[in-house]
């Protein structure tokens, strides 16, 4: 049986990346909540960055 998680960086960024979050009102709310909480990584696209 094929496993459910078939990783793809492109799909991951398109669905959960920063630009995808900024597109919708709900996504912007997620970002603002994560900023308020003080998250180092706001979205999956931040994982590439050096801190």
From Swiss-Prot:
Any GO BP annotation: translation
Record keywords, A-Z: Ribonucleoprotein, Ribosomal protein
Cellular component, GO annotation: ribonucleoprotein complex; ribosome
Listed GO MF terms: structural constituent of ribosome
Database matches in InterPro entries: Ribosomal_bL34, Ribosomal_bL34_CS
Annotated family: Belongs to the bacterial ribosomal protein bL34 family.
HAMAP family per record: Ribosomal_bL34 (MF_00391)
Name of the molecule in the record: Large ribosomal subunit protein bL34
Lineage, highest ranks first: Bacteria, Pseudomonadati, Spirochaetota, Spirochaetia, Spirochaetales
Gene that specifies this protein: rpmH
């Amino acid at each position: 049986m094929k496993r459910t998680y078939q990783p793809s960086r492109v799909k991951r960024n398109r669905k959960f990346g920063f630009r995808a979050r900024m597109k919708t009102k709900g996504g912007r709310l997620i970002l603002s909540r994560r900023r308020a909480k003080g998250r180092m990584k706001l979205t999956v696209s931040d994982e590439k960055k050096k801190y």
